[in-house]
């Protein structure tokens, strides 16, 4: 059942809500707009708040659902395995030739099902950094790197600390282009509509 939990989580994570929302509700191929990313930030910057919100809700929701299904299939171990694979699916979607999003929204879905306390603190870090710097990407990177530390602070089991480290590394890696733009001073701030 662990293998089934992993497989279902990967498939669910692969569902590209940003692409589907943009393509079939707004008639736009989001992979050809802005940064080409399927995440909520790029959708918002190119199509507006409603498509962005739908994308974010879908990406958070699939993270939550994958963990829930994993727990039904194989208890806590199933939930933990699903947490890894739903994020991998979102980053490397089988439906988009193994391209995907930057995993932040799906990570929040996983965190909601793991620990509300951790979720609230990580979200506060993301929001604070984003509002102060006006860079969504910087907020995402900093909150991602904080995940294992916040999990450790709240005394989560070692297996979840490993999950937190994995999420931190993945978020950092998926934002490598943003990091280059931040360093060069070309990253878009809140209110601009080019890179996502």
Curated annotation (Swiss-Prot):
Subcellular locations according to the entry: Cell membrane
Pathway: Lipid metabolism; phospholipid metabolism
Topology in the lipid bilayer: Multi-pass membrane protein
EC main group: transferase
Catalysed reactions listed for this entry: an acyl phosphate + sn-glycerol 3-phosphate = a 1-acyl-sn-glycero-3-phosphate + phosphate
Disulfide topology: none
Keywords, ordered alphabetically: Cell membrane, Lipid biosynthesis, Lipid metabolism, Membrane, Phospholipid biosynthesis, Phospholipid metabolism, Transferase, Transmembrane, Transmembrane helix
EC numbers for this chain: 2.3.1.275
Domain of life: Bacteria
Keyword Disulfide bond: no
Predominant cellular place of this UniProt entry's protein: membrane
Molecular function per GO: acyl-phosphate glycerol-3-phosphate acyltransferase activity
GO-annotated biological processes: phospholipid biosynthetic process
Keyword Aminoacyl-tRNA synthetase: no
Family annotation (Pfam families): G3P_acyltransf
Transmembrane segments: 1-21, 53-73, 78-98, 112-132, 152-172
GO cellular component terms, semicolon-separated: plasma membrane
Function, in words: Catalyzes the transfer of an acyl group from acyl-phosphate (acyl-PO(4)) to glycerol-3-phosphate (G3P) to form lysophosphatidic acid (LPA). This enzyme utilizes acyl-phosphate as fatty acyl donor, but not acyl-CoA or acyl-ACP.
Similarity-based family: Belongs to the PlsY family.
Classification via PANTHER family: GLYCEROL-3-PHOSPHATE ACYLTRANSFERASE-RELATED, INNER MEMBRANE PROTEIN YGIH
Assembly mode: Probably interacts with PlsX.
Designated name of the protein: Glycerol-3-phosphate acyltransferase
Organism: Carboxydothermus hydrogenoformans (strain ATCC BAA-161 / DSM 6008 / Z-2901)
Lineage of source species: Bacteria, Bacillati, Bacillota, Clostridia, Thermoanaerobacterales
Gene name tied to this protein: plsY
